[in-house]
Regions:
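Residues within the helices of the helix-turn-helix
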Residues: 17, 28, 58
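DNA major-groove recognition helix of helix-turn-helix
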Residues: 45-46, 56, 75
Length: 84
């Protein structure tokens, strides 16, 4: 049996918000980094309604000066899914 980690989207969104604020960046600053026409995607990430693409997570890690693993939050061990 294998235990499969599951990303906690809400906690990851909270973490993205925390990391953004810790670096002193605004949502508009991130919008400019990504070249987005609107900030909606970033707000969705922060609310846990959507996940950034892997490419965007790598950019966030570089901007926040952290690792990719520092951005993504997984559900706790008791909530991990088991598969055969």
């Amino acid at each position: 049996m294998h235990i499969i980690p599951v990303i906690d989207m809400a906690a990851t969104g909270i973490n993205i918000t925390r990391l953004r604020k810790n670096t002193g960046m605004t949502v508009r600053d991130l919008q400019e980094v990504f070249g987005f026409a609107t900030p909606q995607a970033i707000y969705k990430w922060q609310r846990g309604e959507a996940m950034p693409t892997l490419d965007n997570i790598v950019v966030l890690a570089a901007v926040f000066e952290v690792t990719v693993d520092d951005i993504i939050i997984y559900r706790n061990q008791n909530q991990l899914r088991e598969i055969a």
